[in-house]
Amino acid sequence: MNAALQILKDRGFFQQCTDVDGLSALMDKGPVTFYVGTDPTGPSLHVGHLVPQFALLHLRKAGHIGIDLIGAGTARIGDPSGKTEMRKMISYEEIDENVKKIEAQLDRFIGFDGKTAKTDNNKHWLADLNYIDFLRDIGSHFSVNRMLTFEAYKKRMETGLTFIEFNYQLLQSYDFLKLHERHNCCLQIGGDDQWGNIVAGVDLIRRKTSHEVFGLTFPLVTRSDGKKMGKTEKGALFLDKEMTPVFDFFQYWRNVADADVLKFFKLFTFLPVAECEEISAGDINAAKERLAWEITAVIHGKEEADKARDGAKAAFGGGGDKTSMPTAEISRSLISKGIGVIDLYAEVKLGGSKSDIRRLIEQGGAYYTDKNGTETVFSDVKTVVDEKFLDKDGELILRAGKKKFMRVVCK
């Protein structure tokens, strides 16, 4: 197997390939141009988008040429793959704004140089497409019977598949054809839920050009408990730090299950596999902290990763810099005259609604750090928090449950 493909396989990026021997032989001959697509249906990428992007960087490092295709055209429809219902339609203007934000995120992560890594946008060839001509030229090569055998469509047939979504596979296949024509792109990579779309694109190019191209998919990443990776209590784990604060991003990885550590090291860091295995075989808490730091450094930079790590240490009583913790400011007068503990938690937006906070306190899950640095439980929902609750720095460190912290600064 070609060395680049072996790297993907060793790190857990390999699920299916249309012709692994043919692709391996092509890669042995020299650089292969490949692409991964991302639809800008939201203002930020989330962790679910990261696997193809890490694969892109591994292939690029091995000498191949990557294209990040931003799907401003396909985002107008929405991909039915992996969805139980039709994606909510958003305006063209909102899609264009999302494109700008996502391109900037990808550029920080990938570093587009226009040679070894570049972007394209399928809006260029889809926005003004003549539908009749498209049906004659492209649609005539597709079998409805075969399309309905693919998992993405079979699942949606149970809940209702709209005609507009049914067109998505044709459009994604057309993307592959256009990238083959524009950039000599010979490989599409993506999650395994894209297998049907990728195979259809490979087949379309063969029919239209007689050229052989390839498709490769990655396993859909789930946690060891079977849940979707990157999902939190607040929803998706976004790369935009305004949507998911860096501290929360760090803490997500710091708190992954023991069984997931090695897998996530291989997928979401660039450390050699042997080093990933060595770290994961050692102290598991140290391994999780290293995992969290490595991923946060890749996405947000080393300085932000250091701050998040220091904030986590301070939150959990292991030293560190508490100014790096999530912080809320409240009026000094509220503390001076006293504020009910439920109202305090609500004021700093920790613990959910007031009824949630009441239950949290009644179940013994609300804490503060006293002047001696000792964490103390709020045992009474009627507790009034005043200046005697402040720590030696005149601040409050609050905790809700096992993992949510807030540094409260009185102004």
Q: Which residues are covered by each model-predicted region?
A:
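Conserved nucleotide- and phosphate/pyrophosphate-binding catalytic cores
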Residues: 204-411
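N-terminal catalytic cores of NTP/NDP-binding nucleotidyl/phosphoryl-transfer enzymes
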Residues: 22-80, 188-195
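Flexible loop/turn segments at secondary-structure boundaries
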Residues: 43, 75-77, 127-128, 196, ...
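Short, hydrophobic/aliphatic alpha-helical segments
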Residues: 29-37, 66, 173-182, 222-223, ...
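Positively charged, low-complexity intrinsically disordered leader regions
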Residues: 1-34
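Divalent-metal (Mg2+/Mn2+/Ca2+)-assisted nucleotide/phosphate chemistry catalytic cores
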Residues: 11, 91-92, 98-99, 103, ...
